[in-house]
Amino acid sequence: MAVFTVNGKTVTAEKNQKLLRFLRDELRLTSVKDGCSEGACGTCTVLIDGKPTKACVPQTDKLEGKTILTVEGLSDWEREVYTWAFGEAGAVQCGFCIPGMVISAKALLDTNPDPSREEAAFAIRNNICRCTGYVKIIDGILLAAKCFREGKLPEAPVDWKVGSRVHRVDVAEKVTGTGQYPDDIYLDGMLYGSAVRSQHPRARVLAIHTEEAKALPGVVCVLTAADIPGSNKVGHLKKDWDTMIAVGDITHYLGDAICLVAAETPEALAQAKALVKVDYEELPAVHNPQEAILPDAPLVHREGNLLAHKHIQRGNPAEALAKSKYLITRRFSTPWTEHAFLEPECAVACPDGDGVLVLSTDQGAYDTQHEIMGMLGLPAEQVKVRNCLVGGGFGGKEDVTVQHHAALIAYLTKRPVKVKLTRAESLLIHPKRHPMEMEFSLGCDENGIIQGVAAECIADTGAYASLGGPVLERACTHGAGPYQYEAYEIDGWAYYTNNPPAGAFRGFGVTQTCFCIETLLNEMADKVGISPWEIRYRNAIRPGGVLPNGQIVDDSTGLIETLEAVKPYYDEAVKNGDPVGLACAMKNAGVGVGIPDTGRVRLVVREGKLHIFAGASCIGQGLGTVLVQTVCGETGIARPDVVYERSNTWMAPDSGTTSGSRQTLFTGEACIRACQDLKKALEEHSLADLEGQEFYGEYLGKTDPLGADVPNPVSHIAYGYATQLCVLDKDTGRIKQMVAAHDVGKAVNPLSVEGQIEGGVVMSMGYALTERYPIDENCRPTVKFGTLGLFRANQIPEIKPIIVEKPGLNVGGGAIGIGEITSIPTAPAIAEAYRRYDGELRTELPLKNTPYAKK
């Protein structure tokens, strides 16, 4: 037992436990987030006697007489200042790391009221952010310091039209910690659930012994596949993922669930899981695509080890390459990458009449609903899903991980339940970025004009399909780069293995093939005798040009403008003798390739305010703010009269998955269409007069399938374009500056766009230089959150985001999604900078022999 002070009140911790658990589970101080419980991420940072401390480290018995402060204990003035400053700076995206950042900022400003930028960055070095790239968080800390010194707050922006730099709609609840992520929910009678996982990557389950676990006091149920009332199979596109492995069936990877346990307390849950015994017949595993392709390879799935093959061809690349004056062929390798979102997967499910209500953190409420419907054998009206705040996704929360398990327990026990992954489970279970082995050949004429490209790509898609097929397809369609030439051919294969699954990850396969084509183009520039900038300018796709996939691009195409935007920075680096690398990229907005892709919005007038309902997840990218700005701009309704509602499946229409950089364009266009009807009604009525009325908008983006035999095929509604460059310090070899110019069509909220660019650049700096996700001979990841190699605030260089607004797109207000492309050209730009630094051509990520490389 220990007695100490929390937020000015004396408290008693009767049992010895982690401070994090005491603050959250007993005091309900949920601003203190559980991001890893390993002392690595900093989301649980509190002040102990004025010193920032990770609450997941100290035991309560060691805190006798201590004084502890959480965000809930800040003064009203402090909360106002941090909310305004972080909003003004654009420091908040998913928000999961922000309360911990605020506490670290307070520790700094209490002792240093006028810190330098370097001091602010150092103060949050133990707080990881995966969204923002830290730039705007540091800006927010410096703004807060200024407000505290001056004793006043400036006015927040009042112009909420499209194009304005506004505070995000959810900034206050994220800064003060009052917003709810699923793990922040505590309900009367709530159970705690978790899965017992496979001990072998590939083994037949012979028996599951649950008797001892069921007999343990506090255990409510132990469920196996035999208890599932509907289908045991789930899967985002292909139903090949087992909810639980049944007796007699074979495991596919170490993350497979064998059974589910639900108990009254977390302690009873942990004890019960340890009592479950499973008999296995161990079987040979498939470790990589090279093994998967062998004629006598074990089958990961009955239908074979090949998930997908993609072949794309236009023109005759073999002939074009043969006639090229210059030809380069290289092999490339890119690694597994962990999303490392700060919020581990969590869901709370409750019985709801004859069905269930699931409170979730994912990238598509309707996708989750459909998975649960199939598993429980229930119609849509009996399965309700509502998004809470989502603590980052980046593609890693498109597949169900805990939602269906929580739903099953709640449905069968008629009790509410929380199912949450530990950080170790999260690192193992959710799909990662595909590792790829690639070979690219590039041919150019004497002027550096691309004649043709031929390529092959092999991807490890892991244990389950997830989105492996579409990821491979996108890698192939975009492997040609954003250039105009007619001869392109690529073959891609994705193979099942017994490794963790691979699926969607920011960039969706394009990060891998972009690394190849851009690296070759930089090398080719030397052969031709021109600069990397010039070779791109000569080949860049322009309005009216034809991409290698056959699509004629429209007037919104802005690649040239991004090249011109970085030119002064490129020339300055060359003039100063600084090693500089350059790369371009393009990325589609929307699903495209003939697949139905729809955005939907419902506007409802309630109690004199307009409520926005869209079944699209906001995962930190700022969709809610985009829709509010759209409504204010289109209708003239004042910001205080507009309410953004979180996604759900009973009131918000299905707006598709938050993926493919699609929501700003597709759901944004749907919102514009709904606003047009509302605006007509407002010509004759006040908003109050329209009480109870609804206004619906829908936009269907029509595209052509790959290989469609039609004139001028349209693979995607829109593309974003980018040019990034990396400047190294010529003495130290460390990155001095990253410049990122992005064509976004129309920047709805430039503050958010800058934050997306900065965050994407830092994420791919890690991809290029430091991040690792090693897997051992037992198909087990050998990594913890703290050893992933994530960049920290005091390690980032100057980042210069440049917003290029090229008009011409006639949907979505001209806005093109930017969530993915920000991470795509970074790695090849960095690789080229190091080639200029030391002459070494690097074709494998993460890059070797740099000052950032692990010793």
Question: Which stretches of residues belong to each language-model region?
Answer:
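Signature of N-terminal electron-transfer/Fe-S-associated modules in redox systems
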Residues: 1-155, 593
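Short beta-strand elements
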Residues: 46, 173, 179, 183, ...
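Glycine-rich loop/linker segments at domain edges
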Residues: 90, 164, 170-176, 305-347, ...
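Flexible, low-hydrophobicity surface segments
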Residues: 145-309, 327, 412
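C-terminal catalytic domains of large/alpha subunits in multi-subunit enzymes
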Residues: 225-226, 377-382, 412-417, 446, ...
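Phosphate/diphosphate-binding loops
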Residues: 257, 263-265, 414-462, 669-688
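Helix-loop-helix junctions that connect adjacent transmembrane helices in secondary transporters/permeases
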Residues: 294-376, 540-609, 618, 691-714, ...
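Thiamine diphosphate
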Residues: 393-414, 418-419, 623, 627
